């Protein structure tokens, strides 16, 4: 088979760091609820999350292989990075989008409000999973 990626430092030990973060806001009126959702959607859109994740991958010493991002209607966003320990061969081909050298970083947002209650909520799920020599725990320093 051509175009195989060379694995190095592979140790079959997956290291994962996951966060589930919640923000609950008292929003008495429909206008306040929608204003909160608009604010969250602007602050945590896929472009902004991508920039934050670029910084995160630099912190753990990973190189980004591929980025997939999506904003949702009416609200919410998802971003996934495939990562490697070091830069790979340039122009590996489209198959690199489905396969990875070391692992992934994902962020998913879930802003919502309850129309019959005075609540607006925001949940973000962050998952960093690696194998090999890089570790997500270095982001905690």
Walk through the language-model features, giving the residues of each.
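Polybasic/polar functional segments that serve as interface/processing modules
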Residues: 1-141
């Amino acid at each position: 088979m051509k175009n195989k990626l060379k694995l190095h430092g592979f140790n079959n030990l997956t290291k994962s760091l996951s966060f589930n973060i919640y923000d609950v806001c008292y929003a008495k009126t429909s206008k306040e609820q929608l204003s909160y959702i608009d604010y969250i959607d602007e602050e945590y859109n896929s472009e902004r999350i991508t920039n934050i994740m670029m910084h995160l991958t630099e912190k753990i010493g990973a190189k980004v292989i591929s980025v997939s991002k999506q904003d949702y209607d009416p609200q919410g966003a998802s971003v996934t990075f495939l990562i490697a320990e070091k830069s790979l061969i340039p122009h590996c081909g489209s198959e690199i989008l489905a396969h990875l050298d070391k692992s992934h970083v994902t962020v998913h947002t879930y802003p919502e409000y309850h129309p019959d209650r005075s609540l607006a909520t925001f949940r973000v799920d962050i998952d960093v999973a690696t194998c090999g020599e890089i570790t997500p725990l270095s982001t905690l320093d």
